[in-house]
Amino acid sequence: MLPLVLFILLAATLLFWKWQGNHWRRLGLEAPFGWPLVGNMLDFALGRRSYGEIYQEIYTRNPGLKYVGFYRLFNEPAILVRDQELLRQILVGRNFADCADNAVYVDHQRDVLASHNPFIANGDRWRVLRADLVPLFTPSRVRQTLPHVARACQLLRDQVPLGRFEAKDLATRYTLQVVASAIFGLDAHCLGIHMRVAHEPSRWLEWLAPLFQPSVWSLLETMSLLHTPRLGRLIGHRYVPLPLQHWFRELVEARSGGDNLLQWLAESKRGLGKEELAGHATTLLLEGYETSAMLLAFALYELALNEDAQRRLHIELDEVAQRHAGNLIDPVALGELRYSEAALLEALRLHPAMQALQKRCTKTFTLPDQKSGASSELKVHLGTVLVLPVQAIHLDPALYPAPNQFRPERFLNQPPMGCRFLGFGAGPRMCPGMRLGLLQTKAALTTLLQDHCVQLADEDQCRVEVSPLTFLTASRNGIWLSFKRRTRRY
């Protein structure tokens, strides 16, 4: 009797899995079969490939389709959007309100400070939180942060590393120095003598630098953030660890007055309380240092690989420096560095901080036919996740000829257009700190390359591999470079 019961249970389980894995096909949609538990994300679950690479494969295998059905972890049906017009409708057009929520899972009771992040917040709350931050990043406000950036650049200039160095580590030291000063009015001690004296470590580096480092734990965190809150609760995940939450609250209490972002927030009309200030400070700090550090490291790497692009950038630096008496950390001079900014945008195209955006349907709406000329619309139900594959879009040869080549000229004569470039997102939920991020990164790139050439530390070094273990893009084995002094031509 027992063998028969077990056989029936096994057969029922297999039939259920088959039925579940054919969800999209039953609705007449072209889609791969979804395997039990892992859906189409097996290599991601095993830490073999990043989630961006999985989505890129689905994107590439389905040319001619406006969208593709697929299965996330735990075989959850989802939709990957390919069509540029559909992307526009979802991000900035008539369907924005239907899927305005970002599908990122954080326990708001355990992660109180992270819950103030407008990227994470959902419902109507994200609008209120974003409205608090937007006034901090107007062009005039961003210019007011330039003294903080200039001080960090001076420290960076005084100690350009000799010999082999890891680019992301150097970039993280710099961006932490900037954001600590710009947000709190504090010195993070990440550059200067503290960089050279091993027995005087910076608390900022000790606590924040490891936060986004690849590890098995970071893979579990990425799964819980992007796929299932149940896993997050099971492993006790916090986007902002508890000791950091306590420390951020202390920093808010100890902030200095003057021209810093936190002081401007405290003086805002909404009259923010200490907990709201701590939440916004957490957002500004975590999103202000990591993504900019990643961009600076990858920009240096791409310029080391592409000598012609680096040569052209040096020519621009020399020409602009000649017009400004050698001072490039100046709002007018930085604005004239168009090729340098194009190089940063091109590095961000090749290495986006987030490899995909995920939107959760907040009300039922209808997608057009999957293929042009077909006559079968798809009703998207409440709770369905729509994936906007940033990495795949950025590497689509139909949108960018020779997409794997580093060509800053793509962005030289025109800004990124439409939804072809999603390095900062798009629409009402676009990154509000884009201007400050580009300013601090461009200033650092200028400082490092005004008197130096950058090159690979090892001539036979292969292309940098992206770690499959992290939520934000990171290198698997580091980005190892070296500097060589050059003579300015002015």
Curated annotation (Swiss-Prot):
Family statement: Belongs to the cytochrome P450 family.
Gene: Cyp308a1
Function: May be involved in the metabolism of insect hormones and in the breakdown of synthetic insecticides.
Superkingdom, taxonomy of origin: Eukaryota
A GO cellular component annotation in the UniProt record: endoplasmic reticulum membrane
A single GO molecular function term of this UniProt record: monooxygenase activity
Subcellular location: Endoplasmic reticulum membrane; Microsome membrane
List of residues binding heme: C431
Cofactor(s) required, per the database record: heme
InterPro entries: Cyt_P450, Cyt_P450_CS, Cyt_P450_E_grp-I, Cyt_P450_sf, Insect_CytP450_Detox
Keyword tags: Endoplasmic reticulum, Heme, Iron, Membrane, Metal-binding, Microsome, Monooxygenase, Oxidoreductase
Catalytic EC class: oxidoreductase
Topological category with respect to the lipid bilayer: Peripheral membrane protein
Designated name of the protein: Probable cytochrome P450 308a1
TM region(s), chain numbering: none
Cited PANTHER family: CYTOCHROME P450 (PTHR24292), CYTOCHROME P450 308A1-RELATED (PTHR24292:SF104)
Entry EC number(s): 1.14.-.-
Main location per the UniProt record: endoplasmic reticulum
